[in-house]
Amino acid sequence: MKKTHITEQKFADLGLQPQVTEGLEKKGFEYCTPIQALALPVLLTGQDIAGQAQTGTGKTLAFLTATFNHLLTTPEHEGRQPTQPRAIIMAPTRELAIQIFNDAEPLIASTGLKAALAYGGESYDKQLAKLQDGVDILIGTTGRIIDFYKQRVFNLNNIQAVVLDEADRMFDLGFIKDIRFLFRRMPEPKERLNMLFSATLSYRVQELAFEHMHNPEHVVVEPAQKTGHRIQEELFYPSNEDKMALLQTLIEEEWPDRAIVFANTKHKCESVWGHLAADGHRVGLLTGDVPQKKREKILEQFTKGDVDILVATDVAARGLHIPQVTHVFNYDLPDDCEDYVHRIGRTGRAGASGHSISFACEEYAINLPAIEEYIEHTIPVSEYDASALIQDLPAPIRMRAPRVQQRRTNTGGTRSGNRKPQGRRPRQPRQSAPKQS
């Protein structure tokens, strides 16, 4: 969790339980972000909320603080067994569930409440053992939670707090039937504290809130512009044959501390990964079919700085807390306008600055007008000198090789050809977007 000081509202002035305040203070959290300052006073009165806030705004800490505080101030149901959860936090992806659990650890330590994870792609037996040790707060994805429920590992009769994170993404991924299945097996909405968070409060999200929450108050934190003002956006129009060389030239020029390269398909991500790995970059691959253990390892390496570049599909565009991402490269412009916002939102988080570089190539330039209409501004265009691009690129590594390369080495020599691009034209923001034929 990233320390921020965005409002003058202090956690210490909210009337939280001392154990909760202690956990926050030990991690250095003193002031609330806007979503925390708006949501927590409402939640601490026992009022449900449907919150609209994008990733990177501090919403995870908001609902964790409210959940832990609610369980400390609300007597548990009479006759409850230690294996029966009192709170449930549902996330659309296992990576997000893991991140929520990690963010909860300071509060787990300070309050003594027990939390457990339940998500697919990892050993059922290991998670079962954790649940059988006792659980107050269950964090996970709906599929594995339902698996445990149907095996009668626990019931949902004692639920006193519910969080649905990234609700719009739940719809996108087709999990809404699972969500309704779980909601219908919990106590009535008025008997529990309900929290829903979504990047957009669309009609279908509001309908879900109306159906399974008790008179929720809408809390909206929407920036004046959909893309953060701390993010420098830039657009290139590469030909298909220049696209990979341009990416590698820009990486050589920018030399980002931590970058994410987004492509639209698994196959394209593997291709980009192969080229970057062959060129000696410390690069990881994150797509939907990468085994869970390897996904966790790659994310850990990326977060620690052992991997500099992460090549990913949109599976990584939402929900993941990856601090200090300096650059986002949209190798492919996304088909969904909202995905553009979520992708570049990986950088420029919590007050930091960031740089987003997008390619409007021959295949995906058609997506640009809709994206610019959605973000309500044109993206500044830069030109490049094709003759200055890196020419001597090695053949890409195929996927039989490991997905994460070892630390990059410097031989001290120079490579032949135009290895260091010279004479690239200065980047000039456009006056208006050029038309694509």
From Swiss-Prot:
Annotated binding of ATP, by residue: 53-60
EC numbers: 3.6.4.13
Subcellular location: Cytoplasm
Top EC group: hydrolase
Keyword vocabulary terms for this entry: ATP-binding, Cytoplasm, Helicase, Hydrolase, Nucleotide-binding, RNA-binding
InterPro entries: DEAD/DEAH_box_helicase_dom, DEAD_box_RNA_helicase, Helicase_ATP-bd, Helicase_C-like, P-loop_NTPase, RNA-helicase_DEAD-box_CS, RNA_helicase_ATP-dep_RhlB, RNA_helicase_DEAD_Q_motif
Main location class: cytoplasm
Record's catalysed reaction(s): ATP + H2O = ADP + phosphate + H(+)
Motif Q motif in this chain: 9-37
GO function term, MF aspect, one: ATP binding
HAMAP family: DEAD_helicase_RhlB (MF_00661)
Subunit structure: Component of the RNA degradosome, which is a multiprotein complex involved in RNA processing and mRNA degradation.
Protein name (database record): ATP-dependent RNA helicase RhlB
Organism: Vibrio parahaemolyticus serotype O3:K6 (strain RIMD 2210633)
Record lineage: Bacteria, Pseudomonadati, Pseudomonadota, Gammaproteobacteria, Vibrionales
